[in-house]
């Protein structure tokens, strides 16, 4: 199961993911949620992702390519230890924009209008 909580403020959308990014409805949901965002900056928080498979890693690359083509700024935030290990093993760190500090800068009080949640 994948849970995505969305925060949007000042032209920046953060998709907080928790659970599994694996082949099936989880990958399709993340793809749909990320590519439907109208903000110029999209952040995908991977700190609570417990499992990711080859399809999930492929989606990270696909979304990064999509963002470059659409001239959007896409950054992956705080990959969990499991996700980071696979990024290192597959040498995707050169292909993905990864940050460990943006979550702290963005955190703050969000009103209900800027918060959404989806579960698959």
What are these language model-derived features?
Residues 1-51, 61-120:
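STAS-like cytosolic regulatory interaction modules
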């Amino acid at each position: 199961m994948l849970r995505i909580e969305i925060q949007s403020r000042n032209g920046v959308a953060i998709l907080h993911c928790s659970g599994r990014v694996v082949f099936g409805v989880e990958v399709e949901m993340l793809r749909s949620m990320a590519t439907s965002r109208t903000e110029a900056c999209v952040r995908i928080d991977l700190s609570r992702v417990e499992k990711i498979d080859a399809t999930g890693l492929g989606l990270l690359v696909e979304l990064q390519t999509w963002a470059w083509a659409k001239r959007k700024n896409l950054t992956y935030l705080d990959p969990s230890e499991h996700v980071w290990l696979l990024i290192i093993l597959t040498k995707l760190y050169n292909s993905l924009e990864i940050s460990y500090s943006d979550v702290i800068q963005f955190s703050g009080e969000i009103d209900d209008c800027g918060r959404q949640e989806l579960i698959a």
